[in-house]
Amino acid sequence: MGVEIERKFLVKGTDWKKEAKGQFYQQGYLSSHPERTVRVRRVEDKGYITIKGKSLGASRAEYEYEIPSSEVLELLHLCEQPIIEKVRYQVEYEGLVWEVDEFQGANSGLVVAEVELADEHQDVRLPAWVDQEVTQEIKYYNSQLIKHPFSQWAISPK
């Protein structure tokens, strides 16, 4: 079984963007239940399908498979709407790679950073541009942003 261990944070400012290159992502959900999601993702000319289990702390079961690019567009049309669109940047800091997602569309204005860890107790030095931790807050799951987009939140994060 594949296990993903990651922590998620809000991002402040744009200092992280200075040396980062971004890739455009489109992703949708065939199932968006927080305890089990089935995600379809397009990254440039590649496609992926990912199955994720229930989160236990910062860990969850994850299985990801590459799918033909010809099928990813068809599968995205079958997904719950709207599709998530974002630019993902990779930023190295203190020996770890941080993935910073800058959302577009109905989630424009939301920027989050995720870092994958070897284990839940791994020490992590936080970059100055990292703000509040939101690892356990379901509303920040991409699968929930399709149902409750950031633009519709009554109170926006910092």
Residue ranges and their predicted role:
Residues M1-K158:
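Phosphate-end processing signature that detects enzymes handling 5′-triphosphorylated RNA
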